[in-house]
């Protein structure tokens, strides 16, 4: 089960992101509150819109209601972010993979929080990824991952919680053996 969550962060190239979503073969598309504005701009009809709905344009809410999109409205004052609520729903839907779109840009605190959500998702046993026009962000925890790219692509490996151990990088300009 593969789920796309569209957030309210920065999306500058709607054509590119729309093609990523269409090629993603997602089982569900969920909008985290204002992410519905982005979905609307890309002519995407999500399966769910979740949050306090304080960032969604009113006419977009009405449009998606007419399209029978499922809404889950929550109070503004709550313990979880709108995106955490989307992740909880994804978990209930038995997601094996979650891709976050629109998770970067805008407020730096939101960007950092969204990157930290990768760890939160991974701890649930779900494989997460952030996708933007410029980068893809993964998290690896005691596992092997394969990243495909082209000559000239930039790859950064950053330890988040502790020192990275057992890291081997092959077929790169700067290979690494633990």
Predicted regions, residues:
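Short phosphate-binding loop-to-helix
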Residues: 70-92
